[in-house]
Amino acid sequence: MIGLPHYLVVAAILFTIGVFGIFVNRKNVIVILMSIELILLAVNINLVAFSAYLHDVAGQIFAMFVLTVAAAEAAVGLAILVTFFRNRGDIAVDDASMMKG
């Protein structure tokens, strides 16, 4: 049977991959956004796993809110990225400091 430690190990692996992706690929904005999504997925797995382990629904409800915020963050981030690519022709992180506003 799959227990709480299995979920925690999977979440820890996903969190580590996400942090590793941010530190290794600092130049590519798309990889940074995907790594942030992996980190949020690991947090959601922890929330749902502990919620099921403790027989409490609050963690699962909070995970739904985190998923909603993550979807909005991804949509806004990709919209800014598309606009930035149309204006500059490149999506390097170094050029982000040249944005107006």
Swiss-Prot record:
One Gene Ontology term of the molecular function aspect: quinone binding
Cellular component, GO, one term: NADH dehydrogenase complex
Major enzyme class: translocase
Taxonomic superkingdom: Bacteria
Record bears the keyword Zinc: no
EC number of the protein: 7.1.1.-
Record's bilayer topology term: Multi-pass membrane protein
Residue ranges of the TM segments: 4-24, 30-50, 61-81
Reaction(s) catalysed (UniProt annotation): a quinone + NADH + 5 H(+)(in) = a quinol + NAD(+) + 4 H(+)(out)
Compartment annotation: Cell inner membrane
InterPro entries, sorted: NADH_UbQ_OxRdtase_chain4L/K, NUOK/Mnh_C1-like
Keywords on record: Cell inner membrane, Cell membrane, Membrane, NAD, Quinone, Translocase, Transmembrane, Transmembrane helix, Transport, Ubiquinone
Cited Pfam families: Oxidored_q2
Keyword Transport in record: yes
Biological process (GO), any one: ATP synthesis coupled electron transport
Subunit organization: NDH-1 is composed of 14 different subunits. Subunits NuoA, H, J, K, L, M, N constitute the membrane sector of the complex.
Chain's role: NDH-1 shuttles electrons from NADH, via FMN and iron-sulfur (Fe-S) centers, to quinones in the respiratory chain. The immediate electron acceptor for the enzyme in this species is believed to be ubiquinone. Couples the redox reaction to proton translocation (for every two electrons transferred, four hydrogen ions are translocated across the cytoplasmic membrane), and thus conserves the redox energy in a proton gradient.
PANTHER family in alphabetical order: NADH DEHYDROGENASE SUBUNIT 4L-RELATED, NADH-UBIQUINONE OXIDOREDUCTASE SUBUNIT ND4L
Family: Belongs to the complex I subunit 4L family.
Name the UniProt record assigns to this protein: NADH-quinone oxidoreductase subunit K
